[in-house]
Amino acid sequence: MIGIDKVQEFLGEFKTNYVIIGGTALNLNLSDSDLVERATKDIDMIMLCESMTPEYLSKFWDMIRDGGYKPSTISSENGEKLTFYRFIEPTDPSFPSYIELFTRKPEGIILPEDIHLVHIENTDDLSSFSAILLDDDYYNYAKEHATESHGIQIIDKFALITLKARAYVSNLQLKEAGHDIRQHNIDKHKNDVYRVAF
């Protein structure tokens, strides 16, 4: 998997600050069981807000800079807008092709129900990030099932099975409700459950 060594290099000493989910976690679990990995190029990372430190955020930003990433853009009414929760197109090909950030709503903050992003400030640096909000159950489940593999923090295979099954059902329901969900994005989660479970 391209870029795992870079994540370990930059974030290896900060394992309590994050947990990696998705295809990268799947591949590392498969690798630990001597099974064939699925092609993946990205890192989906939950930032653990209870234990997040300025040192971790600074190291994370070093990884983004050294990889030559740029923030992705989304279309808005006023034109394209930079997003600081998804970093893409690294100039150094030894880094993951993109990194996407997730977290949960910080304690004591009241947000409108339709908000799906939260701002993460690094007080010791001018840099800051955003992250896609997860519901508390998903966030806590991933955190409780964090394990170390290849020098980084990922979710274990039991959590992968549960979360992949949930993603399969969710995408299937969205497609049945008329949303534009590609069949590939439904089938891959089902196939991943079979692969990691056996």
Identify the residue ranges that each predicted region occupies.
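Compositionally biased terminal segments of proteins
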Residues: M1-F198
